[in-house]
Amino acid sequence: MTTKNLETKVTVTSSPIRGAGDGMETEEPPKSVEVTSGVQSRKHHSLQSPWKKAVPSESPGVLQLGKMLTEKAMEVKAVRILVPKAAITHDIPNKNTKVKSLGHHKGEFLGQSEGVIEPNKELSEVKNVLEKLKNSERRLLQDKEGLSNQLRVQTEVNRELKKLLVASVGDDLQYHFERLAREKNQLILENEALGRNTAQLSEQLERMSIQCDVWRSKFLASRVMADELTNSRAALQRQNRDAHGAIQDLLSEREQFRQEMIATQKLLEELLVSLQWGREQTYSPSVQPHSTAELALTNHKLAKAVNSHLLGNVGINNQKKIPSTVEFCSTPAEKMAETVLRILDPVTCKESSPDNPFFESSPTTLLATKKNIGRFHPYTRYENITFNCCNHCRGELIAL
């Protein structure tokens, strides 16, 4: 920074001059002093200081600024400006140039002599003053920016407070109406959404009611079927117990008959052996039979041998005919077996011959008495719908 084209203007306003005679005379203050400093040649101008102190008035420490109004007066505080040394730069002019003060004071300065300040010192002072002014300006700009931000924030706060105040008082009808309109639109949207949800829930409720009816009918049909199956199971269990008892009785009687037939076989063998004493042995004891049929066949052979030994070979025509009117009575076990067969299958039991009293019925005849109640239609909307039909229904199911 150089001092080229540096111009400083100092203007001192004139103050009223008091006349003589009252003891408070004042001299005419110095007029406006225009000081222009620049780097010029020492050959043409003499070097004068632009920073010389003005000649004070007779009352030192009082600056006459003219007539001041009390209500417009302002207190001015002095602010000390500290400039760091690093911010100060020195610009040394050339030897052929010098700083010369171009301004001069008009008037007479009392008690002061005009002196010459060296160019380097004057230049450093000017630089310091300019740096202070720039720092002051920068700080003032920062303060201005901060104050403007505070003003903007305060304006926004005041606006919001005004809105709140107006809304609380109730004078701002437009704001109130806008709020009511927004709330109304929001309520309309919520009402539409609730209406759609209600419609969906009603549809779901209707579908669930249909499903409930279907499952109720299924439950009733299954309960009827369960009752029928329970009754059928009880009847089958009772028949099973009766058949088991009859079979046990038949086996017991058969075992008794087997023991008696074995004893009869032994007696017949002893009789036949004793009859052949002293004669040619035509019969010798064979292997013991392993079943009741073999035992009966063996006894029949022994009886024929004894008969031929005692009676000889007698013709068949000479044998006495056994009356055909003789009827055999059934044993208790046989009667029980016949009763069970008659209960299980009456028709087959009547048609069976007397030679085969222990006719075995097929498994399908055991469930012949079960009612036909489980009928289904293949083209229904819901699968496995059971129609409760009686056992007389034989027609075709038609879905309407």
Curated annotation (Swiss-Prot):
Span list, region Disordered: 1-58
Positions of post-translational Phosphothreonine modification: 348
Tissue: Detected in adrenal gland.
Entry keyword annotation includes Cytoplasm: yes
Short motif Tankyrase-binding motif, span: 18-22
Subcellular location: Golgi apparatus membrane
Entry keywords, A to Z: ADP-ribosylation, Coiled coil, Cytoplasm, ER-Golgi transport, Golgi apparatus, Membrane, Nucleus, Phosphoprotein, Protein transport, Transport, Ubl conjugation
Modified residue annotations for Phosphoserine: 15, 49, 353
Reported induction: Up-regulated by retinoids.
Post-translational modification comment from the UniProt entry: ADP-ribosylated by tankyrase TNKS and TNKS2. Poly-ADP-ribosylated protein is recognized by RNF146, followed by ubiquitination. Ubiquitinated by RNF146 when poly-ADP-ribosylated, leading to its degradation.
InterPro entries: Golgin-45, Hsk3-like
Highest taxon of source: Eukaryota
Gene Ontology biological process terms from the UniProt entry: Golgi organization; Golgi to plasma membrane protein transport
Pfam family, one: DASH_Hsk3
Signal peptide (UniProt feature, chain positions): none
GO CC field: cis-Golgi network; cytoplasm; Golgi apparatus; Golgi membrane; nucleoplasm; nucleus
Composition-biased stretches (Polar residues): 1-16
Coiled coil feature spans: 120-213
Region of interest called Essential for interaction with GORASP2, as start-end residue ranges on this chain: 394-400
Function statement: Required for normal Golgi structure and for protein transport from the endoplasmic reticulum (ER) through the Golgi apparatus to the cell surface.
Notes on the domains: The tankyrase-binding motif (also named TBD) is required for interaction with tankyrase TNKS and TNKS2.
Name assigned to this protein: Golgin-45
This protein's encoding gene: BLZF1
